[in-house]
Amino acid sequence: MGKGNNMIPNGHFHKDWQRFVKTWFNQPARRHRRKQNRIKKAKAVAPRPAAGPLRPVVRCPTIRYHTKVRAGRGFTLREIRAAGLNPAFARTIGIAVDPRRRNKSVESLQVNVQRLKEYRARLILFPKGKKVLKGEANEEERKLATQLRGPLMPVQQPAPKSIARAITEEEKDFKAYQYLRGARSIAKLVGIRAKRLKDAAENPDDVTKAPTAVKRNKT
């Protein structure tokens, strides 16, 4: 049958069509194989978390999705150092590091630094050699260690807490989309406008260098 408001398909079968029928009888076996591979991987990385290394909390790209958060590729070098860790050491204790990523806001830096500190507080670090160093677990603590099979510190969407109240006249007149578009335009053209003002100050007689003010109509 067709899906949605689309045309009902007609196969027009010709030329011994039975030979070209695709079957999916291997789906149960594939499901079993995926499960066995997950178990095999969990045993190989034990006692480390089966889900892999810790990932940062990042915003989704584009205006459409930037209100949502998800798990990113790796923590920035700035986040790692702000949490009191070394990037090389962080990789050895199950923390993903992405040197290409940059922090564009103080909020993202604070959230991920707190995430790293919380992970470090929960972590039971096994000693590499016979001698137990500072920050490593002793024998009693190592006996309590169990492998985490589920998601490692899953990312949760921030729930907005709003109280019901009357909408003010100022809020009714405020156009959020136009305000955001204007703010992005100002941020984009700040360098061009600064250069234009500088050129106009250096050449006061040049009419082409003078800044032009454009008055926009209210919509």
From Swiss-Prot:
Principal location: cytoplasm
InterPro entries reported in the protein's UniProt record: Ribosomal_eL13, Ribosomal_eL13_CS
Ribosomal protein recorded as keyword: yes
Subcellular compartments: Cytoplasm
Annotated GO biological process: translation
Listed PROSITE patterns: RIBOSOMAL_L13E
Annotated spans, Disordered: 198-219
Gene Ontology CC entries for this record: cytosol; cytosolic large ribosomal subunit
Spans through the membrane: none
Entry keywords, A to Z: Cytoplasm, Ribonucleoprotein, Ribosomal protein
Gene Ontology MF, one: structural constituent of ribosome
Pfam name, any one: Ribosomal_L13e
This protein's record includes keyword Ribosomal protein: yes
Subunit record text: Component of the 60S large ribosomal subunit (LSU).
Function: Component of the ribosome, a large ribonucleoprotein complex responsible for the synthesis of proteins in the cell. The small ribosomal subunit (SSU) binds messenger RNAs (mRNAs) and translates the encoded message by selecting cognate aminoacyl-transfer RNA (tRNA) molecules. The large subunit (LSU) contains the ribosomal catalytic site termed the peptidyl transferase center (PTC), which catalyzes the formation of peptide bonds, thereby polymerizing the amino acids delivered by tRNAs into a polypeptide chain.
Family per similarity comment: Belongs to the eukaryotic ribosomal protein eL13 family.
Protein name, UniProt field: Large ribosomal subunit protein eL13
Name of encoding gene: RpL13
